[in-house]
Amino acid sequence: MKQIYRVDKSGNLAQAISEITAPKLLLLMSNNEQFEQHVEELERHFPGVPSIGCIGGSYGGQTVVADNGVAVIAMEGNLSVVTNVLEQASTMPVKYIGRLEEDINKVAASENNTICIDFCSGNDACVLTTIYSVLGKKHISLVGGTGDGGKVSVNGKIYADADAYALIRNNDGKIKVYKENIYKQVPACRFIASKTDRSKYLIGELNGRPARKVYQDILNIGDKEMATQTFKNPLGKMNGQDICIISIKEVVGDKLECYRQVNDSDVL
């Protein structure tokens, strides 16, 4: 199998996909302004090719394109692919778990030759629990992320409050996903979250103090610098032996709005 990654910093999808010729799966990461346009355009260029998409940053070399870029990942080769969606992500994604179970059977998925990639619109903790209830039985690896804007796409159709997923089976050999934490922990900085709002992804306090003030004191920065920290200095949530990156989206008063949910008593 072969993976192709292409990005256009100006949001020109035609340019980004110009070298893609025989995709078996397409992953779209667009910007908020052009997402619907890009979803339609991608389906028009590659009708019938399975695809999933979300709103998110696109990376070109060392440059992060967060506002108006577009990125596409194409997977080629002897692959069996099925894409689908779990709806009602914020309330009852388990209602649609039968779709995932059926799709696993469609591709004859197994631990060594199949992975799952997902793009979620939100409430990822609940969605992941739902997905793992199925994937865990077959030890199928999962990789993905939560996009912005509360919507995702599957095969040219846009869904709000949903999780888009793709099951990929490599018919020529094995396939596996890996993760890498590119951040280093700041020494002696561990906090207990409180006064959180799970529905709005807000952290009110860290160790009993206003979250904004604590964050600024650690980094010795002011209000103006807060907006530049999303990719530089994220918080990390302890999840067993793993650290889950929780990037800060924006400051809301003395609270921090994040890209992932944080609960009271979570260790950061």
Give the location of each predicted region.
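Small-residue-enriched flexible segments
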Residues: 1-45, 49, 54-268
